[in-house]
Regions:
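A glycine-rich helix N-cap at a beta->alpha junction
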Residues: 68-72, 130-152
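Short hydrophobic alpha-helices that are characteristic scaffold elements of the AMP-binding
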Residues: 105-108
């Protein structure tokens, strides 16, 4: 499958089966995150892999992870991030989002589904998972095999703004 069709057919899955994700597939997903580009190659991503029942239950007490059998808590190390000198913008959110996108795309290519989650209180996650202060919780990528009907890839013609509303040539 070419890249365009891969991303066109990817969707946010919110119903996962109980089937565990194979260890070698988890490693491959994490490897894709490792090779994702980051500003000045600073690699500020720090990823907590939660696949044990106890850890997943703790996380699900403060964030809806849709009963996924695997959750990646994507954090950024505030001490290992590039900052643009002109306006002091740090790239922590950008870098970790690129890493997450790479992992999410690889997940789909392996037949595993995902949902990117940002609706949570980061301080609660830091507390229950004992995350150190130098790490900022950015997002959660919940992963698993789908237990729902795959939506049509034609949905984008109705759900997305036309290109001429989001892109400008000058």
């Amino acid at each position: 499958m070419d890249f365009f069709n891969l991303i066109k057919n990817r969707y946010s899955c919110r119903n996962f089966s109980e089937k565990e994700i194979e260890k070698e597939k988890i490693i491959k997903i994490l490897e894709c995150g490792k090779i994702a580009p980051t500003a000045c190659n600073m690699q500020p991503q720090r990823i907590l892999v939660l696949n044990e029942k106890n850890s997943l239950e703790k996380l699900s007490s403060v964030a809806n992870i849709y009963n996924a059998p695997l959750a990646l808590v994507i954090c950024g190390d505030k001490n290992s991030v590039w900052t643009r000198p002109f306006d002091k913008k740090n790239t922590l959110d950008i870098d970790t989002s690129i890493v997450t996108t790479y992992m999410m795309s690889e997940t789909h290519s392996l037949g595993i589904k995902s949902v990117w989650i940002c609706f949570f209180d980061p301080s609660q996650i830091k507390t229950i998972l004992n995350i150190p202060n130098n790490l900022e919780v950015i997002s959660i990528l919940a992963l698993g095999y789908s237990d729902e009907k795959t939506p049509s890839s034609d949905r984008y013609s109705q759900e997305r703004l036309p290109l001429n509303k989001t892109t400008f040539f000058k």
